[in-house]
A protein has these predicted regions:
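Bacterial Sec-dependent N-terminal signal peptides
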Residues: 1-24
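Sec-dependent signal peptide cleavage junction
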Residues: 18-55, 148, 156-167, 171-174, ...
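N-terminal, leucine/charged-rich tether regions that mediate assembly and partner docking
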Residues: 20-128
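Structured segments of extracytoplasmic/periplasmic soluble domains
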Residues: 70-81, 149-153, 157, 197, ...
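Soluble oligomerization/assembly scaffold segments of membrane-associated complexes
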Residues: 111-192
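Extended alpha-helical coiled-coil "stalk/arm" regions
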Residues: 176-228
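Leucine-rich amphipathic alpha-helices with coiled-coil/heptad-repeat character
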Residues: 184, 191, 198, 205, ...
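Amphipathic alpha-helical coiled-coil segments
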Residues: 215, 220-259
Length: 273
C-alpha cells in the first residue's frame, strides 16, 4: 500500500510539473495571454497583395531603417533571402522556417516608423490567401517569440556595425603609423647618406698648415665652404624632418592606444541574449 501511495505521489508531482511546463510554454496559453505577455499587437493593415490583413506587430525604440536592415541580416544569416512586395513589405516565399511554422510557408514583413522608433508588422501564410492570425495559438506564440527575439538581433546589428566602424578607424590609424614608419626609415637612410658625404668631404677638403697657408687656392676654399654649408643645411633639414615624423608617430601611437581602449570598452557592451 505504501508503495502504491509513493508511486501515486511521484506521478502527481510529475503530472503537476508537466502541466506547469505546458502552461508556460504552449497549449495552456490562450492567444490573448500570449500577446499580452510578449507585448504584441494585432493590427489591420493593407497587405502585400493589396488586401486588408491582420498582422502581428511590435514597436522597437530604434530607427526604422536600422530595424529593417537588422531583420534582413538575421534572415540572410539563417539562409533566407527576401523579395520586395507591395506596400513596403518584403517576403520569404515557399520556405521551411521553423521559428514561425513547422511546414512550408510564406511570411511577409514591413517596417514603418522614423529615426526614433520603428514598428515591425509580420504576416504569416501557409498558402494563397491563407493568412494565419492570433486565432491560431501556435502561429501566435511563434510570431510573438520571433518578434521578441528581434530586440536582441537589432541590438547585435547596431553593436556589430559600431564595432566595424571602430575597427575601420583602428585600421586607418595602423596604416597611418605604417606610412610614418616608412617615412622615418627613408629619412634615416638619407641621414646616413648625408653623414657619408660629410665624412668623404672632410677627408678630401684642404687642410690648413703653416706650409700652405700663404699659397692656398682661395676659389677652391670658397667652393669647399659652400659645399660644407650645403651639407650642413641638408643635415639640419633631415634631422628636423626626422624629429617631425617621430613626433607624428608618437601622436598616432597615442591615438591608436586610445582607439584600442574604445574598442575594448565597446566589446564589453556586446548584447546578451
Amino acid at each position: 500500500m505504501k508503495k502504491i501511495l509513493s508511486v501515486f505521489a511521484v506521478l502527481s508531482i510529475s503530472l503537476g510539473a508537466f502541466a506547469e511546463t505546458l502552461d508556460t510554454d504552449t497549449v495552456l496559453k490562450d492567444p490573448e495571454t500570449v500577446l499580452k505577455e510578449y507585448k504584441i499587437e494585432i493590427r489591420n493593415v493593407n497587405g502585400p497583395e493589396d488586401v486588408n490583413v491582420r498582422v502581428f506587430s511590435k514597436t522597437y525604440l530604434y530607427p526604422a531603417e536600422t530595424i529593417k536592415e537588422a531583420i534582413k541580416a538575421r534572415l540572410e544569416k539563417e539562409g533566407l533571402y527576401t523579395k520586395k512586395k507591395d506596400n513596403g513589405f518584403f517576403a520569404c516565399m515557399g520556405v521551411k522556417y521553423n521559428p514561425l511554422w513547422h511546414k512550408m510557408l510564406d511570411f511577409y514583413i514591413n517596417v514603418v516608423g522614423s529615426e526614433n522608433a520603428g514598428t515591425v508588422n509580420l504576416l504569416v501564410s501557409t498558402g494563397y490567401d491563407n493568412y494565419m492570425d492570433e486565432t491560431n495559438l501556435t502561429a501566435c506564440l511563434n510570431a510573438a517569440r520571433w518578434l521578441s527575439e528581434l530586440e536582441y538581433d537589432i541590438k547585435m546589428y547596431i553593436f556589430l556595425n559600431n564595432l566595424s566602424a571602430e575597427d575601420e578607424t583602428l585600421a586607418g590609424l595602423q596604416k597611418d603609423i605604417e606610412k610614418l614608419q616608412k617615412q622615418k626609415a627613408k629619412i634615416e637612410k638619407k641621414i646616413e647618406t648625408n653623414a657619408e658625404k660629410i665624412k668623404k668631404f672632410e677627408a678630401q677638403r684642404i687642410k690648413l698648415t703653416e706650409d700652405n697657408v700663404n699659397n692656398l687656392d682661395t676659389k677652391k676654399l670658397d667652393r669647399e665652404k659652400e659645399q660644407d654649408r650645403k651639407l650642413q643645411d641638408e643635415k639640419n633639414a633631415l634631422n628636423y624632418d626626422l624629429n617631425e615624423v617621430m613626433l607624428q608617430i608618437e601622436v598616432a601611437e597615442g591615438k591608436l592606444a586610445q582607439q584600442m581602449e574604445v574598442i575594448k570598452k565597446l566589446k564589453e557592451t556586446e548584447p546578451k541574449k
